[in-house]
Amino acid sequence: MLNHTRNNIIYAFMWLSLLVCAGCTSVSSTDAPDSTNEPKAGLASEASALPDVIDPDKSVLVTDDSFVCLSSMRPVRGFFVGNLLGNLEETVAAANQPAGAPYPPGSIVQLVPAEAMVKHQKGWNAKTNDWEFFELDVKEEGAKIKVRGSTQVVNKFGGNCFECHQKAKPQWDLICEEGHGCDPLPIPDFLIRWTQGNDPRCD
């Protein structure tokens, strides 16, 4: 019991440190600056001209129970994917497409336990490529959705998720990885891996 409590305290402290350092870490793998001289021509310019309008008829159902232990999801290059509509292989195929590809509806992407992004049906929100961002309260008994939405989701430390992810080049569908165009995360890999491996929902 003592060790269990101690582990929970350590987990909470490390997760707090992770978010404070990162500002916004929503579902991005560790990134690094582009080694090429190409401009970061992500979705920022074109997205700014689009209205932030949600079509509820195009929503994928997302509840607290949609978010599970990270080790129950499919690992892809240091982050984790799933699909709430049962199309896991399509999501994995998009994640593994060398030239980039749009993720299918129902896709869920997570880097760390307490933040996620979910892809709704086409037309849900053109500004975010139909992605919705989530901040979660994660405990042993499960996850609770604390904050959710399109462009206005800001975590408790002031990081705007969409503003981070819109810097990804168009072919990457707002997914941040090394070379995708997003700002690098000032977090060592070991800290991200430690946080992933200490998801309190996992046995």
Tell where the protein language model's regions lie, with residue ranges.
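Bacterial N-terminal signal peptides that target proteins for export
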Residues: 2-14
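N-terminal secretory signal peptides
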Residues: 38-105
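Bacterial Sec signal peptide processing site at the extreme N-terminus
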Residues: 25-37
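Sequence context surrounding c-type heme c attachment/ligation sites in exported
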Residues: 28-31, 55-56, 70, 76-77, ...
